[in-house]
């Protein structure tokens, strides 16, 4: 659906380009000529399904668990380290600016318990090392589906806060195991 787009300030131009501009024309032509459309996120699947339901197939992102072994996390840690990765040029698009504001308030309210690891536009290997040393990953705010970082974090045993909408689980046929703490673009959530 369109509802998540309305949360992203300044996204109107990008939406317009993909809905009616040159990018839309090229994308539609490729979809028409393709034998199939592999959609790795709920958002991609739903975007193609209305016009190309015979071609659109949901194929979740694969994770090699041997490359990301589960780590030991204490059941009741004295402190909880939250990890947030920020790409300066995509901060508003992913909602990390809003998530960071809430996280900083939480750290001010509970300074002895809440710790923040913040990666700002760092190389991916450094990003992963910082993430692996944390307990909770704050992923994308405006997504219905976790991306690779969210999936890798869960494989390592971290709690993930981000996109985990019911529609995504329904598409996968999953009715019971819903491990992501889903948040809405509302600071009270």
What spans do the regions from the language model cover?
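Membrane-proximal helix-turn-helix segments that form the acceptor-binding/catalytic region
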Residues: 4, 12-37
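Helix-loop-beta element that forms the nucleotide-linked donor phosphate-binding surface
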Residues: 28-33, 37-39, 44-63
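Conserved donor-binding/catalytic core segment of Leloir-type glycosyltransferases
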Residues: 63, 67-94, 100
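A conserved nucleotide-sugar
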Residues: 80-82, 97-126
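Short alpha-helical segment that forms part of, or immediately flanks, the ligand-binding pocket
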Residues: 128, 150-155, 169
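Acidic donor-binding loop of glycosyltransferase active sites
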Residues: 132-145, 158
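Short hydrophobic beta-strand element within catalytic cores of glycosyltransferases
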Residues: 159-166
């Amino acid at each position: 659906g369109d509802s998540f787009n309305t949360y992203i300030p300044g996204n109107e131009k990008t939406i317009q380009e993909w809905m009616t501009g040159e990018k839309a024309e090229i994308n539609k032509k490729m979809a028409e000529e393709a034998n199939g459309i592999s959609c790795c996120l709920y958002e991609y699947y739903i975007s193609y399904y209305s016009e190309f339901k015979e071609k659109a197939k949901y194929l979740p992102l694969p994770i090699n668990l041997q490359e990301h072994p589960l780590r030991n996390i204490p059941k009741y840690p004295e402190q909880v380290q939250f990890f947030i990765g920020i790409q300066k040029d995509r901060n508003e698009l992913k909602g990390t600016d809003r998530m960071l504001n809430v996280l900083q308030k939480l750290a001010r309210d509970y300074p002895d318990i809440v710790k923040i690891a913040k990666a700002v536009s760092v190389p991916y290997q450094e990003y992963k090392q910082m993430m692996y040393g944390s307990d909770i990953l704050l992923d994308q705010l405006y997504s219905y589906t976790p991306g690779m970082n969210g999936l890798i974090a869960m494989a390592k045993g971290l709690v993930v806060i981000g996109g985990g909408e019911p529609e995504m689980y329904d598409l996968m046929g999953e009715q019971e195991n819903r491990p992501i703490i889903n948040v809405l673009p509302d600071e009270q959530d």
